[in-house]
Amino acid sequence: MARYIGPTCKLARREGADLSLKSPARALDSKCKLEQKPGQHGAARKGKLSDYATQLREKQKVKRIYGLLERQFRNYYKKASTKKGNTGENLLQLLETRLDNVCYRMGFAVTRPAARQLVSHRGVLVNGKSVNLASYQIKAGDAITLSEKAQKQLRVQEALTVAEQHDMTPSWVEVDSKKFSGVFKAVPDRADLPSDINEALIVELYSK
């Protein structure tokens, strides 16, 4: 499956936001001007976006934050629209309960791409069973543990240190860094999710 492997700064500038594609310990440097679009004429690209363009940019931003392709993202939207409640909130909750995202939230990896790799390399166990599917949906009460091999990886140990230093662990997960394990306590409410995402724009886009 195709994945973007180019400069993370380029993506961040395209969306005008930090997409959490770099470790908090290596934040986007001063050369990455988020207010300036990438390309030779990026500085000149100003002006008010149309409603459609604004909606499209928000969708692209969220896709890139969670590392999804269009078909995957659209499938999540379709699933969210069939559930009871607010479609936009349902969408974010589905994305947040992906196994790779939960591993990222627990601090087992410094970025979501790194968490996805950890999962695909069979470094993660859910309720004692090895799971290598990044999109696996985690439920409240599920226990996440790293394999013995993953626990010995320096990047995993460093990720946990960074998470503790930057107080990155959200309230809906519980982590025991010494045991390389955690519990997904509950599906997060909208108030607990990123405030810089306007999911209503995505709903408007797909509703057309």
Swiss-Prot record:
GO terms for molecular function: rRNA binding; structural constituent of ribosome. The keyword Ribonucleoprotein applies. Keywords: Ribonucleoprotein, Ribosomal protein, RNA-binding, rRNA-binding. Residues 97-160 form the S4 RNA-binding domain. Transmembrane segments: none annotated. GO terms for biological process: ribosomal small subunit biogenesis; translation. Pfam families: Ribosomal_S4 (PF00163), S4 (PF01479). The keyword rRNA-binding applies. Belongs to the universal ribosomal protein uS4 family. One of the primary rRNA binding proteins, it binds directly to 16S rRNA where it nucleates assembly of the body of the 30S subunit. With S5 and S12 plays an important role in translational accuracy. This is Small ribosomal subunit protein uS4. It comes from Xanthomonas campestris pv. campestris (strain ATCC 33913 / DSM 3586 / NCPPB 528 / LMG 568 / P 25). The gene is rpsD.
